[in-house]
């Protein structure tokens, strides 16, 4: 019954900690450590290791857990952050953006396939900008190498997101670009890695 958890905090960055005996606990701590909860955690540091002493849920993204599309996107976002950010990289702004994107996903009434890829693309673009690796000229070269129409499609997608007011309108328009959005997400993933 021990649980190794990865915590992403506003003030201390990414922290690895162990919750001893949590799976045997009759308290709700094991539920509190669900990856889709914003929690307040009390940690004890022994040598270079952290131990979870207490956990309290601050915000629960409960609607994400009820929709497989929302769950898929949210877990992808968390997995990406886990791979990109190193332990103790403090970044309060990015933490706030992470909570913002999870809150956004949580309140969406539905997610169409094209919009799902659009959210992932927007998230990856945000990470690339944050990490200082977003270079539109280099991305344009990669897109152009595959097909020259790719740049046109990418610009159309950016226009849709700027010019559309309603979420439902954006979702409908993104359906025309499902395959292209999926391809761009893969290109962005490769670019980050």
Q: Across the structure, where does each feature detected by a protein language model lie?
A:
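Non-catalytic alpha-helical scaffolds and adjoining flexible linkers that form interface surfaces
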Residues: 1-3, 8-193
